[in-house]
């Protein structure tokens, strides 16, 4: 009996130890707690953490960098520090957080907006910061895809004719917005018949884009195409066009990034001609990397420490309808590299949710 009791105690202790040793993660979410993209991003991240046995806490900054830094200070300098801190280099905030992290013992993973080349040069100054890597989506390709697909939807342009384009970028100090702009300009270089009449920074905000578009559409009434770096700005610009008595998808063709219910509905009813999405999954895939790193996997050997994932894809009507419905559950544990051969590469893709 004593042996049985001792065995039970040992088993219970082992189970408790496994729970106690579950890697803890804090995610510094740069968005608002009411912002569809960042909420869905965190939800997918939580699903990954739950499946992988990670303890994840999400801290929303409500689009305020000072709040982000306060949350970082609490996580890195307070009691009960996490094993990992996941952050976004929104408005170039990463170096300040890396400075705080020196000597904390907390490992950092950067997602969505990686370090800029200038910031990367500062890494040697943070020699005691445990940065395990970064993972971003192919934002430049997203910007490129939007314009090239808009032109495909528009159809042939008569010889000697031109098309006027209006563009809404995000925030000047957000690397993802800059990269999407670069993709736009690459597409423009390939299609000189398209004239970019004006590019403005809508700060990812619907109301701001609505106000900007109201003036831009008056200034450039012949505009045929609108390129938008996210869904909120596209919806604001669409409303401005509708208020002028014109019809989105007929009089002017719109494009957008993201997969919120409202923008998916616009894709389904034809108001939106081109939609690119997929990067809301980044946080979930980051959980797989953290799980594996905590298990001793050299994640750098499986695609590099700083990885760019080809996550963006054009969302056709059938796919938009699929994304509007209940999402297919993802077996995150099956994506882990634990126990896989050295040749294994993470198959991160939106297709895991669509098939």
Where are these regions (language model features)?
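Extracytoplasmic "Venus flytrap"
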Residues: 24-44, 48-49, 57-71, 88-92, ...
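Periplasmic-binding protein-like
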Residues: 26-28, 79-89, 107-112, 166-167, ...
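Short, solvent-exposed amphipathic alpha-helices that sit
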Residues: 36-52, 142-149, 175-194, 212, ...
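Short, well-structured alpha-helical segments in soluble
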Residues: 67-83, 92, 99, 210-222
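Hydrophobic alpha-helical segments within soluble ligand-binding/sensing domains
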Residues: 68, 133-163, 209, 259, ...
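Flexible loop/hinge segments that line or gate small-molecule binding clefts
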Residues: 99-141, 263-264
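Venus flytrap/periplasmic-binding-protein-like
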Residues: 108-120, 228-272, 281
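Hinge/cleft segment of the Venus flytrap/periplasmic-binding protein
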Residues: 168, 285-355
């Amino acid at each position: 009996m004593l042996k049985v009791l001792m065995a039970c105690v040992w088993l219970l202790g082992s189970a408790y130890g496994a729970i106690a040793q579950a890697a803890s993660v804090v995610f510094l979410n740069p968005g608002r707690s009411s912002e569809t993209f960042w909420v869905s991003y965190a939800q997918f991240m939580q699903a990954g953490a739950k499946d992988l046995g990670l303890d994840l806490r999400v801290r929303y900054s409500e689009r305020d960098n000072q709040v982000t830094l306060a949350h970082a200070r609490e996580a890195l300098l307070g009691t009960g520090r996490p094993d990992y801190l996941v952050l976004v280099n929104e408005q170039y905030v990463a170096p300040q957080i890396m400075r705080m992290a020196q000597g904390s013992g907390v490992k950092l993973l950067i997602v969505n907006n990686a370090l800029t080349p200038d910031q990367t040069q500062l890494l040697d100054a943070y020699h005691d910061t445990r940065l395990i890597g970064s993972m971003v989506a192919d934002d430049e390709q997203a910007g490129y895809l939007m314009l090239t697909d808009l032109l495909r939807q528009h159809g042939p342009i008569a010889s000697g004719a031109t098309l006027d384009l209006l563009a809404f970028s995000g925030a000047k100090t957000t690397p993802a917005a800059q990269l999407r702009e670069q993709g736009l300009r690459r597409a423009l270089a390939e299609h000189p018949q398209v004239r970019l009449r004006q590019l403005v920074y809508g700060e990812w905000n619907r109301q701001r884009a609505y106000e900007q578009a109201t003036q831009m559409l008056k200034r450039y009434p012949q505009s045929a195409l609108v390129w938008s770096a996210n869904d909120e700005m596209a919806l604001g610009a669409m409303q401005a066009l509708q208020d002028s008595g014109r019809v989105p998808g007929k009089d002017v063709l719109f494009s957008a990034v993201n997969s919120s219910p409202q923008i998916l509905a616009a894709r389904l009813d034809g108001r939106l001609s081109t939609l690119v999405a997929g990067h809301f999954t980044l946080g979930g895939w980051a959980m797989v990397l953290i799980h594996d790193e905590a298990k001793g996997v050299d994640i750098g050997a499986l695609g590099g420490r700083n990885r760019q994932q080809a996550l963006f894809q054009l969302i056709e009507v059938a796919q938009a309808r699929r994304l509007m419905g209940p999402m297919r559950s993802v077996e995150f544990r099956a994506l882990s590299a634990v126990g896989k051969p050295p040749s294994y590469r993470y198959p991160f893709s939106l297709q895991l949710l669509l098939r």
